[in-house]
Swiss-Prot record:
It catalyses: coproporphyrinogen III + O2 + 2 H(+) = protoporphyrinogen IX + 2 CO2 + 2 H2O. This is Oxygen-dependent coproporphyrinogen-III oxidase, chloroplastic. GO terms for biological process: chlorophyll biosynthetic process; protoporphyrinogen IX biosynthetic process. Probably regulated by oxygen tension. GO terms for cellular component: chloroplast; cytoplasm. InterPro entries: Coprogen_oxidase_aer, Coprogen_oxidase_aer_sf, Coprogen_oxidase_CS. Residues 1-67 form a transit peptide. GO terms for molecular function: coproporphyrinogen oxidase activity; protein homodimerization activity. Pathway: Porphyrin-containing compound metabolism; protoporphyrin-IX biosynthesis; protoporphyrinogen-IX from coproporphyrinogen-III (O2 route): step 1/1. Its EC number is 1.3.3.3. Belongs to the aerobic coproporphyrinogen-III oxidase family. Substrate binds at residues 173, 189-191, 343-348. PROSITE patterns: COPROGEN_OXIDASE.
Amino acid sequence: MMHCASIVSAPSYAFPFRSGSASTTPTAISLTKRSWKPPPSMAKGPVRATVSIEKETPEANRPETFLRGVDEAQSSTSVRARFEKMIREAQDTVCSALEAADGGAQFKEDVWSRPGGGGGISRVLQDGAVWEKAGVNVSVVYGVMPPDAYRAAKGVPTDQKPGPVPFFAAGISSVLHPKNPFAPTLHFNYRYFETDAPKDAPGAPRQWWFGGGTDLTPAYIFEEDVKHFHSIQKQACDKFEPTFYPRFKKWCDDYFYIKHRGERRGLGGIFFDDLNDYDQEMLLSFATECANSVIPAYLPIIEKRKDLPFNDHQKAWQQLRRGRYVEFNLVYDRGTTFGLKTGGRIESILVSLPLTARWEYDHKPEEGSEEWKLLDACINPKEWI
């Protein structure tokens, strides 16, 4: 079966790829909002965008919306319009908070559009005082889904042969890599996907779903930090459905599994996809709540850990764990691998990768060490709250 992640043409890592759950659950073994404002260099002149693939057009200014005219004209209260508004506000809020935490560095911004409609905003901060590399991207994408992918995605009987299926997708995606090895990496992604009726089947019902998640990847375990992070995820989930947190926590543990290493990328959080079995308004509110929970879940941890002293050994361990991050993203992450195979916007696709990483031959931490404790937790997921 073909996942939608493998049929969507997306020019940005921020694109909301539809991801499947992990194929196998591994066996355990021992071992207040602020609006982001452009820096003075942006405010004085047009926003400059890097040249990328042919199907993208660099834009000098941020538009009010990336929606097509027909969508914009229909209603500003549509789910498409409100989701785009939500992710752009979330991008501004997160970027403002990250710049404040860094104390000096500012995001570089690229704005782009596509001839068929849609576009995106990529923001990256690197070599700051706190952040080695931080990327916060949003995108709105229109495209056409091949018939086989539509049948695979929605379970259309094999004797039906719908024509190409127009789709709409929007999302925010971010990966934040701090410099200090005691400060954890964070990833979050929230996305919305719609398909229109197949072109040869007018009147067929529109399909839609939500996906996303927020997960933490530390190099060293501070139990109070991990408990705080998971508590915020649970609070967001419990406002809507008490089964969400345990269900999405396990989904996260299973999805971010590095099969060739037999370990997970980090200490989890929440992850969900193909979510459409609840009221659409409820799920829009849920995705909004999750996005709004990113800063309160993460920034208090950064403030506590960003200035802790560390030594070369601890930095080297962080770089080894960053190597695991690279392995997962380049080998298993559907958004990244699809973008690389289809000629997407390379700078946006690889924004998730850390500025530096490390690989050592047959490295094994000493049993009982702090490094070993982290590895054990990545191999054997724990219930933190």
